[in-house]
Curated annotation (Swiss-Prot):
Function: Forms oxaloacetate, a four-carbon dicarboxylic acid source for the tricarboxylic acid cycle.
Spans traversing the lipid bilayer: none
GO biological process: carbon fixation; oxaloacetate metabolic process; tricarboxylic acid cycle
EC number(s) recorded for this UniProt protein: 4.1.1.31
Cellular component per GO, a single term: cytosol
UniProt gene name: ppc
Source organism (scientific name): Corynebacterium glutamicum (strain ATCC 13032 / DSM 20300 / JCM 1318 / BCRC 11384 / CCUG 27702 / LMG 3730 / NBRC 12168 / NCIMB 10025 / NRRL B-2784 / 534)
Presence of keyword NADP: no
Name listed for the protein in its UniProt record: Phosphoenolpyruvate carboxylase
Catalyses which reaction(s): oxaloacetate + phosphate = phosphoenolpyruvate + hydrogencarbonate
Keywords: Carbon dioxide fixation, Lyase, Magnesium
Description of activity control: Activity not stimulated by acetyl-CoA in the absence of any allosteric inhibitor, while the corresponding protein from E.coli is strongly stimulated.
Protein family membership: Belongs to the PEPCase type 1 family.
Length: 919
């Protein structure tokens, strides 16, 4: 850790401590300090965990609240300091002229150059390029806008402080530093007096607003900038023949993901689509307003094109002061039309004033883009390239990137629900009496007949359906209306979770047809929505390629795919596959499924786009996105990748413009490299695959013996983690399980992983791997040879390296001594001790095997930056966990007061902040 980072953390921590003493009193401050220092002693091995338990012995809920808040704020400020440090390191490397680091576009251009990648290969990859970060809701990402604003201001002031500290001192340096410190103290005081979390359970609308906040914080500016920069670089390096469509195309699930969430309705789809459109249209209006002020160029000084003059004449801005300023008059007219468009699409209440009413709304984003390009062309013709390359170029890129929709809203529902809806519709329409009970072949016959027929399935004016069916129909109806209003890019994807058959994929197509998103035309349907199977369980992942092979033999579906650019998108579920089979088995099942899909698509002549349903944690497919994309099989990326982003991961990646740029670059860089370069050095692919398959089977056996076969496991899990509290407190809008059940299978992935993260076991990120590796390696001479094989794979194969690195990262955040405190909450001591012993033994065996294969002495030897980050977080995490255990104990004994409930929620959010990838 550099002096600069250490100084920042101490500086911010000291101010926070002084604010706590001032606001809460000396007693609270001293208890915070005692807990912090005790945590440091535990981290250094100079004290036992019981010493921290004793610090909080008998603590009242009222006194626990400021302590939980204190350590949550410490974590928040430490994150801020680390982000600044990462930013500083990047700037220093650039200033020093160092070789660009991996995951940057500069490094990617060098690699493409060294690999002699030609323009034709680049053009082929970019023709259907799509790098899509898809924002999803998360129960612990409930920070309020006020908190984000405070963080933003503190970050700004810290940058000012750094600039002064690194500059040559002057007579005013100290007074300026004092003023900056005063500003930071003011912001931290405001932060301390602001509630970190909401009182009420967040509504879907709240989660939609949280997602939109990141566009305002960074993505509205940074997505157009990176798309523009990539286009410029590609044109310069590979010529005009390379397609220059926007590469980054954002998406969202918030408001459209109704899988297991009864609160997603037609109203939330409408809210999500309208607020997204309103956000981007108002962004355009602001940019045009600025351009109108900036483009004061006079036609007395330079020439303009006839097209620009025509645009200026249509601008209704003939005031004398602007008679010779055609650009201002042109932009004024364009702004008027965008405001008129906003009024038409969103409502007149969304626009101030009435002056825009003389303008005609734009019929499409393309019409708006043409006007912007008219201005751009005129500037370039008159040699004003520098001016064109500024704000206007970002605006043009924004129009190409966002259209009038901002993001693509995905619809997602599970296959069982679609089947239930169609069963009711078919029965009511007298198509078939009990569709659900038909064989697969019989279902297929019914579905194809319906998809070929233009006849409506729902009689006009009919609304006598069950509540569930009515809700589903409302969602599709509203999605169709949004597409008509904002264009086909608004709702271009329909995802079927738990897809396990051909008919699972065809069923939602009937609903899409019913509401005009697919037009029936015999065996040649037309439509604007990609139908995407989501393979989630180990079994479904293994069967996925076979399902698609059968699907593509159906002329109707194959023709539909052809008119969708011949692209088949497939979503892979990291979360449920992990819950189903454990960390290693899930990772191998996913990789093996991709191998099969790549080969199938190659032989069938279909383009493959993979959508990775990754969570923040390693247990849900998390880890560095750059490494994860490079770890995909050759041919699995092909210029396109979609990835879910959620929770603390969103705030960590996109909370400010600098980190947003860095993370967007990482996604684009990895996509280009994985598509155009061979990043694997494997010499015997089949041997590597056989090894993974054998280890996977052993890992699955160990995992299943605990999670699926141990009779006491469910009790251990539900009673030693905050699962019950996640379900009962106001944490997220979605229920914690798909059904009212206590089985692992029906739990949603986020509560499953979040619960293990909070209790610091992190079980989904490693359990079963140690036993599998030990058993596969064996003993004697065979062991020596097999260890060498695994070491070679670790050095030459990004997939295996990524699996081990991600596992080490999550294991470094586990703390089995804390896990024992959670286990002590279980009434049945026999179950508690037995299951805890199994977990503890497997943890240390897994750590041992990791060190054997990597040649390391510890988990993070090869990642000192992350190791120091984990060490810095340790003192903030321990007090939060100890307080959480005490509050859970009270809650379960019947003290479900608001104070106790709030403390549990505070500690959950604090731990999620400190861990930075908790669920």
């Amino acid at each position: 850790m550099t002096d600069f980072l250490r100084d920042d953390i101490r500086f911010l921590g000291q101010i926070l401590g002084e604010v706590i003493a001032e606001q809460e009193g000396q007693e609270v401050y001293e208890l915070v300090e005692q807990a912090r220092l005790t945590s440091f002693d535990i981290a250094k091995g100079n004290a036992e965990m019981d010493s921290l338990v004793q610090v909080f012995d008998g603590i009242t809920p009222a006194k626990a609240t400021p302590i939980a808040r204190a350590f949550s704020h410490f974590a928040l400020l430490a994150n801020l300091a680390e982000d600044l440090y990462d930013e500083e390191l990047r700037e220093q490397a650039l200033d020093a002229g160092d070789t660009p680091p991996d995951s940057t576009l500069d490094a990617t251009w060098l690699k493409l150059n060294e690999g002699n990648v030609g323009a034709e290969a680049v053009a082929d990859v970019l023709r259907n390029a799509e790098v899509a970060p898809v924002l999803t809701a998360h129960p612990t990402e409930t920070r309020r806008r006020t908190v984000f604003d405070a963080q933003k201001w503190i970050t700004t002031h810290m940058r000012e402080r750094h600039a002064l500290q690194s500059a040559e001192p002057t007579a005013r340096t100290q007074s300026k530093l004092d003023e900056i410190e005063k500003n930071i103290r003011r912001r931290i005081t405001i932060l301390w007096q602001t509630a970190l979390i909401r009182v009420a359970r967040p509504r879907i609308e709240d989660e939609i607003e949280v997602g939109l906040r990141y566009y305002k914080l960074s993505l509205l500016e940074e997505i157009p900038r990176i798309n523009r920069d990539v286009a410029v670089e590609l044109r310069e390096r590979f010529g005009e023949g390379v397609p220059l469509k926007p590469v980054v195309k954002p998406g969202s699930w918030i408001g459209g993901d109704h899988d297991g969430n009864p609160y997603v309705t037609a109203e939330t789809v409408e809210y999500s689509t309208h607020r997204a459109a309103e956000t981007v249209l108002k962004y355009y209006a602001r940019q045009l307003h600025s351009l109108e002020h900036e483009l004061s160029l006079s036609d007395r000084m330079n020439k303009v094109t006839p097209q620009l003059l025509a645009l200026a004449d249509a601008g209704h801005n003939d005031v004398p002061s602007r008679v010779d300023e055609p650009y201002r008059r042109a932009v004024h007219g364009v702004r008027g039309r965008i405001l008129a468009t906003t009024a038409e699409l969103i409502g007149e209440d969304a626009v101030e004033g009435v002056w825009f009413k003389v303008f005609t709304p734009y019929a499409s984003p393309e019409e708006f883009l043409n006007d912007a390009l008219t201005i751009d062309h005129s500037l370039r013709e008159s040699k004003d390239v520098l001016i064109a390359d500024d704000r206007l170029s970002v605006l043009i890129s924004a129009i190409e990137s966002f259209g009038f929709n901002l993001y693509a809203l995905d619809l997602r529902q599970n296959s069982e629900s679609y089947e239930d809806v169609l069963t009711e519709l078919f029965e009511r329409a007298q198509v078939t009496a009990n569709y659900r009970e038909l064989s697969e072949a019989e279902k297929l016959e019914v579905l194809l007949k319906e998809l070929r027929s233009p006849r409506p399935l729902i009689p006009h004016g009919s609304d006598e359906y069950s509540e569930v069916t009515d809700r589903e129909l409302g969602i599709f109806r509203t999605a169709s209306e949004a597409v008509k209003k904002f264009g086909p890019r608004m709702v271009p994807h329909c995802i079927i979770s738990m897809a396990s058959s051909v008919t699972d994929v065809l069923e939602p197509m009937v609903l899409l047809k019913e509401f005009g998103l697919i037009a029936a035309n015999g065996d040649n349907p037309r439509g604007t929505v990609d139908v995407i199977p989501l393979f989630e369980t180990i079994e479904d992942l293994q069967a996925g390629a076979g399902i698609l092979d059968e699907l593509w033999k159906i002329d109707l579906y194959r023709n539909y795919l052809l008119q969708r650019d011949n692209v088949q998108e497939v979503m892979l579920g990291y979360s449920d596959s992990n819950k189903d089979g454990g960390y290693f088995s899930a990772n191998w099942a996913l990789y093996d499924a991709e191998l099969q899909l790549v080969e199938l698509c190659r032989s069938a002549g279909v383009k493959l786009r993979l959508f990775h349903g990754r969570g923040g944690t390693v247990g849900r497919g998390g880890g560095p996105s750059y490494d994860a994309i490079l770890a995909q099989p050759r041919g699995a990326v092909q210029g396109s990748v979609r990835i879910t982003e959620q929770g603390e991961i969103i705030s960590a990646k996109y909370g400010n413009p600098e980190t947003a740029r860095r993370n967007l670059e990482a996604l684009v860089s990895a996509t280009l490299e994985a598509s155009l370069l061979d990043v694997s050095e494997l010499t015997d692919h089949q041997r590597a695959y056989d090894i993974m398959s054998e280890i996977s089977e052993l890992s699955l056996k160990k995992y299943a013996s605990l999670v699926h076969e141990d009779q006491g496991f469910i009790d251990y899990f539900t009673q030693s983690t905050p699962l019950q509290e996640i379900g009962s407190l106001n944490i997220g809008s979605r229920p914690s399980s798909r059904k009212q059940t206590s089985s692992v299978e029906d739990l949603r992935a986020i509560p499953w992983v979040l619960s293990w993260s909070q209790s610091r076991v992190m079980l989904p990120g490693w359990f079963g791997v140690g036993t599998a590796l030990e058993q596969w390696i064996g003993e004697g001479e065979q062991a020596t040879q097999r260890i060498a094989e695994l070491q070679t794979l670790n050095e030459s194969w990004p997939f295996f390296t990524s699996v081990l690195d991600n596992m080490a990262q999550v294991m470094s955040k586990a703390e089995l001594r804390l896990a024992k405190l959670y286990a002590d909450l279980i009434p049945d001591t026999e179950v508690a001790e037995r299951v805890y012993s199994v977990i503890r033994e497997e943890y240390f065996l897994t750590k041992k095997m990791f060190c054997v294969i990597t040649g390391s002495d510890d988990l993070l030897d090869d990642n000192p930056l992350l190791a120091r980050s984990v060490q810095r977080r340790y003192p903030y995490l321990l007090p939060l966990n100890v307080i959480q255990v005490e509050m859970m104990r009270r809650y379960r004994k019947g003290d479900q007061s608001e104070q106790v409930s709030r403390n549990i929620q505070l500690t959950m959010n604090g731990l999620s902040t400190a861990l930075r990838n908790s669920g």
